Regions:
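Prokaryotic Sec-type signal peptides and long signal-anchor helices
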Residues: 8, 12, 152-153
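Sec-dependent signal peptide recognition
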Residues: 1-7
C-alpha cells in the first residue's frame, strides 16, 4: 500500500507539456529567452511583469498575478507565479543548518523536480540582478506566506 501511495504521489507531480495551460507555457518560453539576462531594472518583480506581459496574461498590479493556488493542497505547475512574504526557510544537512529570510520577493515556478522540490526562476537574488534558476525545497518553509498564482489568459 505504501508503495502504491508513493508511486501515485510521484506520478501526480510529473507534468507533461500537454497539461501546461498555454499562458503558463508562454511564461516558461519567456523565462528560457531571458535566462542569464537582466530584465528591466533587475528587480524580482520585473521578471514576473515581463513574463505576464509576454504571455498576454490578465492580472492586476501589484500582486494580482492570477488565480490563487494553495500549493499544499492543489497541483502547482511550471509558469505559476510565486509571491513570497516574510518567509523563513531552513535546510539541514549532516553538519549544518542554513536559514534564510525573504521579506518580499517574487519568483516563477520553472520546473517540478519531485514532491516539494522545485526549480524557480528569479532575479535580484544575493545582489545578482540577472535571471537565474534555483532549487527550492518547499518543505524548508518554516514561517511566512508562500502564495502561488495561476496566470489567466487575457
Amino acid at each position: 500500500m505504501k508503495l502504491f501511495i508513493l508511486i501515485f504521489l510521484s506520478l501526480s507531480f510529473h507534468i507533461s507539456d500537454n497539461e501546461i495551460p498555454p499562458t503558463n507555457a508562454k511564461i516558461i518560453e519567456y523565462i528560457n529567452s531571458v535566462k542569464g539576462k537582466k530584465v528591466d531594472r533587475g528587480e524580482c518583480w520585473d521578471l514576473a511583469n515581463g513574463a505576464l506581459t509576454y504571455a498576454h496574461a490578465k492580472w492586476e498590479s501589484p500582486y494580482g498575478f492570477g488565480k490563487p493556488i494553495n500549493y499544499k493542497t492543489e497541483k502547482i505547475i511550471p509558469g505559476d507565479i510565486i509571491l513570497i512574504q516574510n518567509v523563513t526557510m531552513e535546510s539541514k544537512s549532516e553538519n549544518s543548518i542554513t536559514r534564510w529570510k525573504m521579506v518580499e520577493h517574487t519568483a516563477i515556478l520553472f520546473e517540478l523536480k519531485e514532491t516539494n522540490k522545485v526549480m524557480v526562476a528569479e532575479q535580484n537574488v544575493n545582489g545578482v540582478r540577472k535571471v537565474q534558476i534555483n532549487e527550492w525545497n518547499l518543505d524548508d518553509v518554516k514561517s511566512g506566506t508562500l502564495q502561488f498564482f495561476r496566470p489567466q489568459a487575457n
